[in-house]
Regions:
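Surface-exposed binding/hinge segments that line
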Residues: 118, 152-196
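Extracytoplasmic/peripheral linker and loop segments enriched in polar/acidic and small residues
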Residues: 47-49, 106, 317, 322-326, ...
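Ligand-site clamp/hinge motif
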Residues: 231-277, 396, 408, 417
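Gly/Pro-rich hinge or "lid" segments in bacterial periplasmic/extracellular proteins
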Residues: 185-239, 243, 377
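Alpha-helical secondary-structure segments
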Residues: 57, 131-139, 166-172, 212-213, ...
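Structural transition elements
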Residues: 347-381, 399
Length: 542
C-alpha cells in the first residue's frame, strides 16, 4: 500500500484556492411530495414535412472532455459522440437494447463463455473505409489494452477477441459476463475507424472518425464543437440538418434565455428553477425523462495515486473511519434537501439502481434515515472534534453550488462544518480521477445495466473508482452479479452490494435527476432517454 498521506494536489488546492465557508443560506425545508410526471422522451416529426438543411445550435451545459470513446468519462461527450460515432447497440425510449451497427443481438454459447456479435455490412466510416468485423475487433482491442482506458472494466473478463469472418466478431470470456450487450450500447460499443486510429494514435480524440450521421468538423475549446452531415452515412436520407453546433453555455439562466430568444434551438439540463416558467411560454417545448444514474457524494478513502492504481491510506478521520462517513449520511435529509433545491423536480436516491430497473430490490431502494442525533453519537465514538470540518469540491454552476450550500446547511445539526470548493466542471473530472479531493459532489448519467453503474466505481482498481475504495466482499459480489444470467439472482446480489456500500459509505447516493431538455417549436426529431443523452441525429427544422 502507499504511504500514509493526504493527496498532494488537495493540499495545493486548499492552500492556493479560495474555499467557500458559506453561511447556511439555503433553507432545507420539507415540501409537498413531488407530483407524478409523465416522461416525454421526444418530439416526433410525424406527418409534418421536415426542412432539409440548416444549422441547429444546441446549448450544452458543460464542456465535453476528450472526444475519444476509449478514455472519455463525461456525459456531454456522449451528446456529441452520439451524432458522430454509432455503437454496436443502442437503447430505445423504453430502455430496451436494440442493434445499431450490429445486425442482431449477440448469441451466447451454452457455457456463457463465447459471445458472437453479427456486424452490419455496408456502412462506411467518415473517411470512406468500410465497417467490418475486423474494424470492430480493432476498437475492442483498443478499449481493452490502451493505457488509461475507461472501457476495459465495462467489457468484463475477456480472454480474447477475434473475427470468425468479415461479418462476425467472437468474444471469448474467462468467466461468463452477462452485461456485454449493455456495455456495447454505450461508449465501449462506439466503433472507431482503424485507419484514423493508425494515423492519429493517442490524438484520435482531436479528430474522431467513426460511422455516424454526422462527422467531426472542429472544436473551439470552451466555446463550441461543430459536426456536419456525413454523405457516406448508410442512412443519409434520414438525416436532415447540414450541421450541429454544440455551444458551451454553463449558466442555466443563459441557456434558458437563448432558448427563449431562439438563438439556440435545443438546450440541455434546464434548471428546475426555470422549468415551470418555461413550460408556460409559447414557442418552447420541454422533454423530460427519468435517469438510470445518480448524483451523489464521493469520499476519498484511498485514491492517493489516481484511479486504476492500488489504493493508498489517507490519514484523516473521514477517510479511515466509516463511522464518520456514516455520520455524514445520517446528517442529510434527502427529501427536504432535494425538494428545496430542485423545486420538487428530482427524486431521492440511495443506491446505484433506479427504482424502475428490473434489477431493483427492497435492499437497493432502502435509504439511511435522517438522524443527526445519531450522527453526533458516531462522531463522539470516533473521537473526532465537533464540528468536524471537511471540504466539499463541486462544480461551479449555479445548481451545483445551490446543492452544496444546502448540504452545508443540512449537516450542521449532525456535527459537520462544510467548506465548499467550487471547480470548473472539466477540471473537476480531472480532480476526481487524480484523487485531489477530500469529499466531492458529482454524478453518473447511468446505464441500463447496473454493472455499468457499480462495477467500475466500486471494484478495487476500477477505472471510475474515484474514492479508492476496496472491499473484497464487494468485488466478489459484483463479479458474481456479472456472471449470473437470471435477473432475480443479479438483483439480489446488487442488493447485497448496496447494503455493504451503505455501511462503508465510499459513495453516498443523494438523488436522481429528471433530464429536462428544452427545444424551440420550429424543430422536431429531438429525443432524450433515461441514459441521459440528448439525441439530435434525426432532428430537423420544420
Amino acid at each position: 500500500m502507499a504511504e500514509i498521506r493526504r493527496p498532494a494536489r488537495l493540499r495545493t488546492l486548499l492552500a492556493a484556492a479560495s474555499v467557500l465557508l458559506v453561511a447556511a443560506c439555503v433553507p432545507v425545508q420539507p415540501v409537498e411530495p413531488a407530483p407524478p410526471r409523465a416522461d416525454v422522451t421526444g418530439v416526433e416529426i410525424g406527418a409534418r414535412t421536415p426542412r432539409q438543411g440548416g444549422d441547429l445550435v444546441m446549448a450544452l451545459s458543460a464542456e465535453p472532455d476528450r472526444l475519444d470513446p476509449t478514455t472519455s468519462s463525461s456525459l456531454y461527450t456522449r451528446y456529441v459522440m452520439n451524432a458522430v460515432c454509432e455503437k454496436l447497440y443502442d437503447i430505445d425510449a423504453k430502455g430496451t437494447i436494440v442493434p445499431q451497427l450490429a445486425s442482431a443481438l449477440p448469441t451466447v454459447s451454452a457455457d456463457g463463455l463465447t459471445v458472437t456479435i453479427p456486424v452490419r455490412t455496408g456502412p462506411r466510416f467518415a473517411d470512406g473505409t468500410p465497417l467490418d468485423a475486423a474494424a470492430v475487433v480493432t476498437t475492442l482491442q483498443r478499449n481493452l489494452t490502451l493505457e488509461g482506458s475507461a472501457r476495459k472494466g465495462e467489457l468484463g473478463p475477456v480472454a480474447d477477441v477475434r473475427t470468425s469472418d468479415a461479418e462476425h466478431v467472437v468474444v471469448r470470456y474467462k468467466t461468463p459476463f452477462a452485461p456485454l450487450a449493455a456495455a456495447l450500447a454505450d461508449r465501449a460499443g462506439m466503433v472507431m475507424s482503424p485507419k484514423a486510429l493508425a494515423e492519429e494514435g493517442a490524438d484520435f480524440g482531436d479528430h474522431p472518425v467513426c460511422v455516424g450521421p454526422f462527422s467531426f468538423v472542429e472544436r473551439v475549446p470552451q466555446t463550441s464543437i461543430t459536426v456536419k452531415r456525413d454523405p457516406l452515412y448508410y442512412a443519409a436520407d434520414e438525416v436532415h440538418l447540414d450541421t450541429i453546433t454544440y455551444r458551451i453555455m454553463t449558466d442555466a439562466n443563459i441557456r434558458a434565455a437563448n432558448l427563449r430568444s431562439g438563438d439556440v434551438q435545443v438546450a440541455d439540463s434546464l434548471s428546475p428553477q426555470d422549468v415551470d416558467a418555461l413550460a408556460k411560454e409559447k414557442g418552447v417545448g420541454l422533454l423530460q425523462t427519468g435517469s438510470f444514474g445518480y448524483q451523489g457524494i464521493t469520499f476519498n478513502v484511498g485514491n492517493t495515486d489516481g484511479t486504476g492504481k492500488p489504493p493508498g491510506v489517507i490519514d484523516t478521520p473521514i477517510a479511515r473511519d466509516p463511522r464518520v462517513r456514516e455520520a455524514f449520511a445520517l446528517s442529510i435529509d434527502r427529501a427536504a434537501l432535494v425538494n428545496s433545491v430542485f423545486n420538487n423536480w428530482y427524486e431521492t436516491a440511495c443506491s446505484f439502481i433506479a427504482p424502475g430497473s428490473t434489477y431493483s430490490s427492497p435492499a437497493s431502494e432502502a435509504c439511511p434515515p435522517h438522524d443527526p442525533a445519531r450522527a453526533k453519537q458516531l462522531l463522539a465514538e470516533a473521537g473526532v472534534p465537533v464540528p468536524y470540518r471537511i471540504t466539499l469540491s463541486t462544480s461551479n454552476n449555479a445548481d451545483s453550488l445551490r446543492l452544496a450550500q444546502a448540504i452545508q446547511a443540512s449537516v450542521v445539526d449532525g456535527g459537520f462544518e462544510v467548506a465548499i470548493q467550487p471547480v470548473e466542471y472539466s477540471t473537476l473530472l480531472d480532480v476526481q480521477k487524480r484523487g485531489d479531493f477530500e469529499v466531492l459532489q458529482l454524478g453518473w448519467s447511468g446505464r441500463v445495466d447496473p454493472h455499468g453503474n457499480a462495477s467500475s466505481f466500486l471494484s478495487t482498481g476500477g477505472a471510475n473508482n474515484y474514492s479508492g475504495y476496496s472491499n473484497p466482499e464487494v468485488d466478489t459480489l459484483l463479479k458474481q452479479a456479472a456472471q449470473a444470467e437470471d435477473v432475480a439472482t443479479r438483483a439480489e446480489l446488487y442488493g447485497k452490494v448496496t447494503e455493504i456500500v451503505q455501511r462503508d459509505n465510499p459513495i453516498q447516493y443523494l438523488y436522481r435527476v429528471r433530464s429536462i431538455t428544452g427545444y424551440t417549436d420550429d424543430v422536431a426529431g429531438v429525443a432524450t432517454y433515461d441514459d441521459g443523452v440528448v439525441r439530435l441525429s434525426r432532428a430537423a427544422f420544420l
